Design a protein with these regions (language model features):
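Claisen-condensing/thiolase-fold acyl-transfer catalytic domains that form or cleave C-C bonds
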Residues: 1-95
Length: 95
């Protein structure tokens, strides 16, 4: 996804860049494990979180000034690789 330069992730994690309130918050909802990984509804749960963030409806886990959200979801397996992958990017626009 290009969130940081190769080899730089450890430094960025230690600096808190990906934490809520950081420069590039990642997974403010706690992710799918925090939701019990609702198999079959995983993609919908991710999309709901993105839309709620862009609408400013996330309370304590709200990313301040959220303008763009991205979700990646994979499922099914062919050997050891995912059989299908989707990437969803949503952006807040003015009506």
């Amino acid at each position: 996804l290009g969130l940081c330069e190769p080899g730089n992730v450890g430094e960025r994690l230690r600096a808190g860049d990906f934490a809520l309130g950081g420069h590039q918050p990642v997974n403010p909802s706690g992710g799918l494990l925090a939701k019990g990984h609702p198999v079959g509804a995983t993609g919908l749960a991710q999309l709901y979180e993105l839309c709620a963030q862009l609408r400013g409806e996330c309370g304590a886990r709200q990313v301040a000034g959220a303008r763009v959200g991205i979700a990646e979801n994979g499922g099914g397996f062919l050997g050891v690789e995912e059989g299908a992958t989707t990437v969803t990017i949503v952006e807040k626009v003015k009506a």
